[in-house]
UniProtKB/Swiss-Prot annotation:
The lineage of its organism: Bacteria, Bacillati, Actinomycetota, Actinomycetes, Mycobacteriales. It comes from Nocardia farcinica (strain IFM 10152). Part of the ABC transporter complex SsuABC involved in aliphatic sulfonates import. Responsible for energy coupling to the transport system. It catalyses: ATP + H2O + aliphatic sulfonate-[sulfonate-binding protein]Side 1 = ADP + phosphate + aliphatic sulfonateSide 2 + [sulfonate-binding protein]Side 1. This is Aliphatic sulfonates import ATP-binding protein SsuB 3. Keywords: ATP-binding, Cell membrane, Membrane, Nucleotide-binding, Translocase, Transport. Belongs to the ABC transporter superfamily. Aliphatic sulfonates importer (TC 3.A.1.17.2) family. The gene is ssuB3.
Length: 247
């Protein structure tokens, strides 16, 4: 059984020997993973490799695992779908499930951090896709998580909105410094945001890349380009192929 969510003094997340099978198919096989407090880790791999499965385990959303897991009690998850409730206002979505006083003020503070304080009383249906994802980020931030789990949060956004959302996440991470696990298919996104990029292959963490490129990062930086090439090769993608072949 997976161990209950607990805090650890040496790592924000500690996974040992995690395994998961669905209908007889082994998706994860003895995964080991450590994420330090305040570290930003990106997890990449082919579709169906188990990236989101591992994230859900760390988030406490799936108990059908073998192995052991330690993670902070204070954690929040942002999915690709914003999952806002349409019949309550934006600010009430932000603090849904949060206890304590001054919830409206706390919601507005979180919305201000993502540039949406003016939309606090709006209905979710009036928001663009990018705005809705920013509300989802505010909903995570208002909980002051020690661990932020991002499951392809920009996957449904257009290219320009995606770049703006990436920059926002980078800024918010630098401000609040939670540990972050980002599941993504986008190599450049991983290299722009993370301290470390992991490749999940055959049910295990097959490769790990330390990203030492100075922030803020640029895709035209030669060091960035060299690391991008190595990471694409690790993912089984030809880095010299046309861009469309890498998506």
């Amino acid at each position: 059984m997976m161990a209950g969510s607990t805090t650890t003094t040496t790592a924000a997340v500690r996974v040992r020997g995690a395994g998961r099978a669905f209908a007889g198919r082994q998706v994860l096989r003895g995964v080991d993973l450590d994420i330090a407090p305040g570290e930003f880790v990106a997890l990449l791999g082919a579709s169906g490799s188990g990236k989101s499965t591992l994230l859900r385990a760390i988030g406490g959303l799936d108990r059908g695992f073998t192995g052991t897991l330690e993670a902070p009690r204070s954690k929040a998850i942002v999915f690709q779908e914003h999952r806002l409730i349409p019949w309550i206002s934006v600010w009430r979505n932000v603090v849904l499930g949060v206890r304590g006083r001054d919830l409206a003020a706390r919601a507005r503070t979180a919305l201000d951090e993502v540039g949406l304080s003016a939309e606090a009383d709006a209905w979710p249906a009036t928001l663009s896709g990018g705005e809705a994802q920013r509300v989802a980020l505010a909903r995570a931030l208002v909980r002051h998580p020690d661990l932020l789990l991002l499951d392809e949060p920009f996957g449904a956004l257009d290219a320009l909105t995606r770049l703006k959302a990436q920059a926002l996440v980078a800024r918010l991470w630098q401000q609040h410094r939670p540990a972050v696990l980002l599941v993504t298919h986008d190599v450049e996104e991983a290299l722009l945001l993370a301290d470390r990029a992991l490749v999940l292959r055959d049910g295990r963490i097959a490769e790990s890349f330390d990203i030492t490129v100075t922030r803020p990062r640029s895709v035209v930086d030669p060091e960035f380009s060299a690391l991008r090439r190595r990471l694409l090769l690790a993912l089984g993608v030809d880095p010299d192929a046309p861009t469309g072949a890498q998506s």
